[in-house]
């Protein structure tokens, strides 16, 4: 009995701590201006327990630390998306959605115990002073900063800072004798959620949206204006890997494609009246043929946009069933700068469906395993494996759609695991390919710099057998070469390595453009436009695409964050070995 009670003590303490902390006048404001207030509990029993622990426990207890550790425990008993963010992590969690962060404006990696500049972000302070890709940072503010003890978190802490503050960098540059010193005034570094926009062919525009943030709508309009000037008559919006963001950003973009008074989304919760978001009829692209690309990592605000277009029969959805997040969070800030993002409502698509997939409160492990379960049941490979047991709803034309587990696309594109071997998994998950790409780009920067376009660079890499060079590099760095597996994975390895090197020498947008060549999602989209099927019609059946895509996607979203009275995402994700910004 004593053992059982001792096992439950952490839970009781968690409850006591959180309730004790929440009692009072904490509030937040959602985008419509309504305030949320916590109601004082009529019972002080749990807060009394916390006081007793503080006063009488056998050992001294760090109560602040106990609060920090307890709050996530109690919140996960509610739902998978109510979360606690410590004060030190709040700024980072908001960075990509705010549209900018304060720092020097570089993308870096740590290689051979040295901080290396991979990319200088356009419009940032580092660009103004002349920092270049390939530069080695060997000292920060006069203190040597090299060796095995340096890490990513420490580097970001030293390079980021308040706008207007200074940081002194000592840099070693290839081909230059001695060291160079730079005094950089930190400033606002732009963060764009429209990763790429270009013409797929003479009449088809392509836009990749990686998240829904403060700048998304403005970036989207700028991209659309540019594509329109180039003769765009059809549009592909790529939301693969887009984990979500602000509801208003998704609503604003959806408004551009809908006639007046079309419902886009509505929210409803126990303490919130139903709130509807409708189009205002001033959208510029109401008749533009539209295809939306989604996959299992398209979530939240991405599902709002795709759901609004599908329910209004405004676009054709291509890909795989989306993540299935239909919960709305509101941020509640504490005096110490920390934050709770609490689920306060559900959102519903125009047909009335909630796309939130089922979950068991407190069973976070099962919820997070859902995507693996989909793979195990064959859902990624066969559209017939998609469960459609949820409630049926109808679009404006009367097409059947389903609630309770994401957006099911109109055309299914399966995965192909042909090139996936244990060797490929090892070099991918270890970050070895990213490491090699930096090494290769850095050691061949002068030669590769003469190749003026991403397409020319990609062709050069294929001619020079980059896969063999990578296999030799990996073997020297701890991954034993396995020739049969390398042959099996050759096409996939070549694709990934080419994309990484292009990203290092040009930028992620150029890499995405190279990676999209031959993409089965895009081939299907072009066929839909060619066949005049971008606007869905009644009686059209969902079909599988006969071509296959590779996995994993090279540029999946790096961040997905729950923020504002809007939408969260799933969990933050990143590709192994990814570079960081500062």
Regions found by a protein language model. Name each.
Residues 567, 579-582:
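Short, solvent-exposed mixed-charge patches
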Residues 10-27:
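Hydrophobic membrane-insertion alpha-helices, especially the h-region
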Residues 1-8:
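Short, Lys/Arg-rich N-terminal segment immediately upstream of the first membrane anchor
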Residues 2, 26-42, 46, 50-54, ...:
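Cleft-lining beta-strand/loop regions that shape enzyme active-site pockets
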Residues 57-121, 164-196, 515-526, 533-544:
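Extended, small/polar residue-biased N-terminal targeting/export presequences
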Residues 134-136:
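Structural motif
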Residues 301, 313, 320, 324-391:
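Polar, glycine-rich mid-to-C-terminal structural blocks
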Residues 354-355, 359-562, 568, 575:
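Conserved functional hotspot residues or short segments at active or partner-binding sites
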């Amino acid at each position: 009995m004593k053992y059982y009670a001792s096992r439950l003590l952490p839970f009781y303490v968690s409850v006591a701590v959180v309730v004790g902390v929440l009692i009072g006048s904490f509030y937040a404001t959602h985008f419509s201006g309504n305030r949320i207030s916590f109601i004082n509990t009529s019972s002080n029993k749990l807060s009394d327990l916390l006081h007793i622990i503080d006063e009488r426990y056998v050992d001294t207890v760090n109560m602040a630390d106990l609060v920090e550790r307890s709050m996530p425990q109690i919140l996960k008993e509610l739902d998978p998306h109510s979360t606690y963010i410590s004060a030190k992590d709040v700024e980072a969690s908001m960075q990509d959605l705010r549209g900018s962060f304060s720092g020097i404006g570089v993308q870096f990696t740590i290689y051979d115990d040295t901080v290396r500049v991979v990319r200088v972000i356009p419009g940032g302070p580092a660009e103004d002073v002349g920092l270049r890709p390939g530069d080695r940072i060997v000292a920060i503010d006069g203190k040597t900063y090299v060796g095995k003890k340096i890490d990513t978190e420490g580097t970001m802490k030293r390079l980021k800072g308040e706008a207007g503050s200074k940081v002194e960098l000592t840099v070693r540059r290839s081909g230059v004798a001695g060291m160079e010193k730079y005094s950089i005034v930190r400033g606002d570094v732009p963060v764009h959620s429209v990763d790429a926009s270009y013409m797929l062919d003479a009449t088809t525009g392509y836009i990749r949206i990686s998240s829904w943030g403060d700048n998304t709508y403005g970036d989207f309009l700028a991209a659309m204006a540019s594509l329109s000037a180039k003769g765009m008559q059809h549009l592909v919006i790529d939301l693969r890997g887009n984990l979500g963001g602000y509801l208003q950003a998704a609503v604003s973009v959806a408004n551009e494609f809908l006639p007046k008074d079309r419902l886009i989304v509505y929210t409803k919760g126990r303490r919130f009246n139903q709130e509807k978001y409708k189009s205002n009829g001033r959208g510029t692209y109401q008749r533009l043929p539209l295809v939306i690309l989604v996959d299992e990592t398209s979530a939240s605000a991405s599902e709002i946009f795709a759901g609004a277009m599908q329910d209004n029969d405004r676009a054709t959805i291509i890909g795989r069933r989306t993540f299935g997040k239909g919960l709305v969070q509101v941020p509640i800030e504490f005096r110490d700068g920390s934050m709770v993002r609490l689920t306060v409502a559900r959102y519903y698509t125009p047909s009335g469906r909630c796309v939130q997939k089922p979950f068991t409160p407190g069973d976070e492990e099962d919820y997070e395993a859902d995507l693996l379960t989909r793979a195990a049941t064959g859902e990624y490979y066969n559209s017939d494996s998609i469960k459609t047991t949820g409630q049926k709803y109808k679009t404006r034309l009367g097409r059947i759609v389903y609630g309770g587990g994401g957006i099911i696309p109109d055309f299914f594109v399966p995965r192909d695991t042909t090139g996936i071997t244990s060797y490929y998994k090892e070099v991918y998950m270890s970050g070895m390919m990213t490491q090699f790409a930096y090494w290769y780009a850095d050691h061949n920067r002068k030669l590769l710099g003469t190749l003026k376009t991403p397409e020319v660079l990609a062709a050069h890499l294929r001619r020079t057998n980059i896969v063999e060079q990578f296999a030799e590099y990996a073997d020297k760095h701890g991954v034993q070469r396995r020739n049969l597996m390398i042959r099996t994975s050759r096409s996939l390895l070549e694709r990934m390595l080419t994309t990484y090197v292009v990203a290092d020498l040009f930028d992620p947008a150029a890499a995405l453009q190279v990676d999209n060549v031959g993409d089965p999602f895009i081939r299907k989209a072009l066929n839909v436009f060619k066949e005049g099927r971008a606007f869905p019609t009644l009686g059209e059946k969902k079909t599988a695409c006969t071509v296959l895509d590779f996995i994993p996607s090279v540029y999946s979203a790096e961040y997905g964050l729950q923020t504002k009275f809007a939408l969260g995402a799933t969990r933050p994700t990143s590709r192994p070995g990814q570079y960081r910004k500062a």
